[in-house]
């Protein structure tokens, strides 16, 4: 009986790995063994960084809100505290978008937060 080496399956798997490493440098996109190592690392980084992106975005929103709040004479903490006291439940993503694209509405929200903080 002839030995079965899995030629078609192996070829497909190799093609898939080489396709995934298309933009990689040097042997990492042309030799299967190096390409597979490169792909495993790349996928690992992609997995971790998809989760890290959530924190990156939150930090960006907070930075934008803080900058807009300081333009209104409040700090980020004072603004958030005032919003909580006033019972205004707007998340950071919406607040940051408002600060960038609709500064008039953000100023109105900040004024309500300042009034609630003063009382």
UniProtKB/Swiss-Prot annotation:
What is the similarity comment for this entry?
A: Belongs to the bacterial ribosomal protein bL20 family.
Gene Ontology cellular-component terms for this entry are: ribonucleoprotein complex; ribosome
Protein name stated in the entry = Large ribosomal subunit protein bL20
PROSITE patterns, per database record: RIBOSOMAL_L20
Name a single GO biological process: translation
Keywords carried by this UniProt record: Ribonucleoprotein, Ribosomal protein, RNA-binding, rRNA-binding
Q: Which domain of life is it from?
A: Bacteria
Gene Ontology MF, one: structural constituent of ribosome
User: Which PANTHER family does the record associate with it?
Assistant: 39S RIBOSOMAL PROTEIN L20 (PTHR10986)
Annotated function: Binds directly to 23S ribosomal RNA and is necessary for the in vitro assembly process of the 50S ribosomal subunit. It is not involved in the protein synthesizing functions of that subunit.
User: Is Membrane one of the keywords?
Assistant: no
């Amino acid at each position: 009986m002839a030995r079965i080496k899995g030629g078609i399956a192996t070829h497909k798997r190799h093609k898939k790995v080489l396709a995934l490493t298309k933009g990689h440098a040097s042997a990492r996109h042309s030799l299967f063994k190096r390409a597979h190592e490169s792909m495993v690392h790349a996928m690992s980084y992609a997995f971790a960084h998809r989760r890290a992106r959530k924190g990156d975005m939150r930090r960006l929103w907070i930075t934008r809100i803080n900058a807009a709040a300081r333009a209104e004479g409040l700090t980020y903490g004072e603004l958030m505290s005032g919003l909580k006291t006033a019972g205004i439940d707007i998340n950071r993503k919406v607040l940051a978008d408002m600060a960038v694209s609709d500064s008039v509405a953000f100023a109105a929200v900040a004024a309500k937060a300042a009034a609630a903080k003063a009382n």
